[in-house]
Amino acid sequence: MRLVFAGTPAVALPSLRALIDSPRHEVVAVVTRPDRPAGRGRKIKPPPVHLLADEAGIPVLSPERPRDPDFLAALTDLAPDCCPVVAYGALLPREALAIPRHGWVNLHFSLLPAYRGAAPVQRTVLAGDDLTGASVFQIEPAMDSGPVFGVVTERVRPTDTSGDLLDRLADSGAHLLAAVMDGIDDGTLQAVPQPAEGVSFAPKLTAQDALIDWTLPAVAVDRLTRAAAPAPGAWTVFRDRRIKIGPVRLGAQNVPDELAPGRLVALADGAVAVGTGTAPVLLDEVRPEGRGPMKAADWARGARLTDDDLLHAPAERVSAAGSPAGAGGAP
């Protein structure tokens, strides 16, 4: 088939490579988001999919809006049989959906109808699910609601970050997407409507969502730090400045009894423990505001922790007794 592939970030690269390498299909063009500032220098850079298309000698379309008349005309001239999509990053108008003979087919990183939306992998890790997967479905105007051509399942490991899990799903999903293209091409594959039961949604994980509440159980803190890695990054406040917290570890040993939520202690072996609403957790990596990632033990030595130090939410003052200042008392 003649394919026009739509995708933008690195997670789409395995799928694009699989389709480029397929002897049964020809990727005649790639649609991606326009070049944007990236990195610490905020230099204008093409997205990863654009770079791979350039390497492969494939024409690239980068419309500001997919409903732009020039883009719709160019897509019509390409006469695609099907348009596979992986993390393109923009809503497709009805006019675009009607152009390919077999429509637009999307790789989504959940077992639909669960976790429709922008952040299925992050929400999977945050919920503590032990099974997830990827689905390939026909795009319809309603978000992630179209009939499904096929799925692949993936176990969620106890230490998975969102990045870890997404990398595996990107690889297994690429094989699934290529197989679906084959099935559509030879007419052996029909999409099945999604069930009405089990629908859930996965909105983007914001910076506010990634703020750690140290009064929550240790398992909830663990899930949040893994769900927010690598982005947007779980965070808290230390000495009036933000600090990002990498994935924590459960099962801290030899920690003082009843370590209050947010309280820090440097252990004899160099580890750094933090109190939560249940058991303490161990910090492995932190990123102080304005600095790069560093080992928690090195950060703690440099910070010279005191008994009064606390990780907390913004603008939360803490009394010497360990409770928020003013809590339960008269103003």
From Swiss-Prot:
Annotated spans, Disordered: 312-331
Annotated InterPro entries: Fmt, Formyl_trans_C, Formyl_transf_N, Formyl_transf_N_sf, Formyl_transferase-like_C_sf, Met-tRNA-FMT_C, Met-tRNA-FMT_N
Function in brief: Attaches a formyl group to the free amino group of methionyl-tRNA(fMet). The formyl group appears to play a dual role in the initiator identity of N-formylmethionyl-tRNA by promoting its recognition by IF2 and preventing the misappropriation of this tRNA by the elongation apparatus.
Alphabetical keyword list: Protein biosynthesis, Transferase
An annotated GO cellular component: cytosol
EC number: 2.1.2.9
Residue sites binding (6S)-5,6,7,8-tetrahydrofolate per the record: S110, L111, L112, P113
GO MF term set: methionyl-tRNA formyltransferase activity
Substrates-to-products reaction catalysed: L-methionyl-tRNA(fMet) + (6R)-10-formyltetrahydrofolate = N-formyl-L-methionyl-tRNA(fMet) + (6S)-5,6,7,8-tetrahydrofolate + H(+)
Family: Belongs to the Fmt family.
EC main group: transferase
Protein name stated in the entry: Methionyl-tRNA formyltransferase
